[in-house]
């Protein structure tokens, strides 16, 4: 069996890689926008084309060999965009391997360690009342873990990823706002639901430590991405000075970066993204590094149902999975239209599938309804005109 074609498919803000073979077996994976969060994601698409030059004509079942070639043939390494391409292609190759073997991917990774995968979902409410109401609804639906962005009443149709409001807050109001929002959710759901916050790498270490300490009474499961991702000494400092576990890793993409994070004691949970950090092959290795240090894995999953499917197979096969991020709209709207059927969910868990490969297929006929559009975030401009992290 040989690879005959590697192509990128786009619909709405989502991108996929499809790998075709001369045996008629195809595999799919989800492509992260990488550096494309500021506009058209042409760099990860170019990364796919770069990897396709190597992969076309090769046996798709030799996944580790191909992973190493795609990673190392770029002499100065490819950064996030090439790693995103490798990650999507890797998912597709595992999909092919599972289909060829007639087995679900997790069976090829050592077999299942669990029958279902615990989820956390994000609360998108803009006011404290909205957050409390949504939290109650999610708990009623069966979720036992919830995450929120702890700043701002947004207004203007902005999402938590855009973070509008934080840039206008003083050091003191930042803490007060976080306490008000987290307290509203904790009061709504009671003491036994796990709560997390995500500040999307937007705080300074001083701000992160102050916010973390202010939230100590609310017993957070973890504090996700408090500061910018590059300086591991700073991560170790923050982790040592906040009263809850720190989770980090969605903007890292190599085993070496995660090893550095762990060596600096910068996180108790790592959050690699299968569509950014080299796919199933690489994240299985990241999880092993974490396991050797008694660190949990909480895979990042901000995209659509194909990435969710890949995450489920990884979570099934990896012992030290703590919890899996889950976009609540995975099984509705545009995301539902783009696939034949999403992973089966029962309350706050996804059921490990029995079907060969990843167990999900694209509904390419639906792509015509959803023309590609760029994924953008507005810059956060502080009152003095300076830039805060996007």
Kindly give the residue locations of the regions a language model identified:
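Shared catalytic-loop signature of beta/alpha-barrel
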Residues: 20, 37, 46-53, 65, ...
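Metal- or metallocofactor-binding catalytic centers and their adjacent structured scaffolds
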Residues: 20-100
């Amino acid at each position: 069996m040989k690879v005959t074609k590697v192509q990128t498919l786009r619909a709405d803000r989502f991108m996929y890689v499809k790998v075709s073979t001369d045996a008629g077996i195809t595999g799919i994976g989800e492509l992260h926008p990488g550096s494309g969060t500021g506009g058209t994601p042409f760099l990860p698409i170019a990364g796919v084309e770069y990897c396709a030059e190597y992969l076309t004509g090769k046996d798709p079942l030799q996944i580790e060999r191909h992973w190493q070639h795609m990673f190392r043939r770029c002499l100065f390494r490819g950064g996030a965009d090439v790693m995103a391409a490798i990650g999507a292609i890797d998912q597709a190759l595992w999909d092919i391997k599972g289909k060829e073997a007639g087995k679900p991917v997790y069976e090829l990774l050592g077999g299942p360690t669990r029958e279902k995968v615990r989820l956390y979902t994000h609360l998108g409410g803009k006011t404290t009342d909205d957050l409390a109401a949504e939290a109650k609804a999610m708990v009623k639906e069966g979720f036992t873990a919830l995450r929120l962005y702890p700043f701002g009443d947004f207004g203007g149709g902005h999402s938590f990823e855009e973070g509008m409001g934080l840039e206008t807050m003083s050091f003191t109001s930042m803490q007060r706002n976080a306490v008000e929002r987290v307290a509203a959710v904790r009061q709504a759901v009671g003491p036994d639901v796990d709560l997390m916050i995500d500040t999307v790498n937007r705080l300074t270490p001083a701000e992160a430590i102050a916010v973390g300490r202010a939230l100590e009474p609310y017993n957070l499961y973890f504090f996700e991405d408090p500061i910018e991702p590059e300086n591991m000494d700073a991560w170790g400092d923050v982790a040592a000075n906040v009263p809850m576990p720190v989770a980090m890793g969605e903007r890292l993409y190599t085993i070496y970066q995660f090893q550095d994070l762990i060596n600096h004691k910068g996180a108790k949970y790592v959050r690699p993204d299968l569509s950014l950090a080299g796919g199933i092959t690489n994240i299985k290795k990241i999880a092993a590094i974490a396991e050797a240090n008694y660190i949990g894995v909480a895979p990042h999953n901000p995209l659509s149902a194909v990435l969710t499917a890949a995450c489920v197979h990884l979570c099934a096969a990896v012992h030290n999975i703590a919890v899996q991020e889950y976009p609540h709209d995975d099984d509705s709207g545009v995301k539902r239209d783009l696939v034949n059927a999403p992973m089966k969910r029962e309350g706050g868990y996804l059921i490990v599938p029995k079907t060969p490969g990843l167990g999900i297929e694209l509904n390419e006929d639906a792509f015509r309804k959803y023309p590609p559009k760029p994924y953008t975030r507005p810059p956060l401009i502080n009152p003095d005109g300076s830039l805060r992290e996007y």
